[in-house]
Amino acid sequence: MNLCWQKSIYD
C-alpha cells in the first residue's frame, strides 16, 4: 500500500 499517493488524494 502506497501511503504517499493516498495521502495526496486525502489531503
From Swiss-Prot:
For biological process, the GO terms are: nodulation; organ induction; response to symbiotic bacterium
Which keywords does this Swiss-Prot/TrEMBL entry list?
Nodulation
Q: Which InterPro entries match?
A: ENOD40
**Phenotype on deletion?**
Reduced nodule number after inoculation with Sinorhizobium meliloti SM2011; remaining nodules are abnormally spherical and contain a few small rod-shaped bacteroids, their development is impaired. Bacteroids development is arrested at stage II-III.
Name by which UniProt lists this protein = Early nodulin-40-2
| Record's function text | Modulates the action of auxin, and may function as plant growth regulator that alters phytohormone responses. During symbiosis with Sinorhizobium meliloti SM2011, involved in nodule initiation and essential for bacteroid development during nodulation.
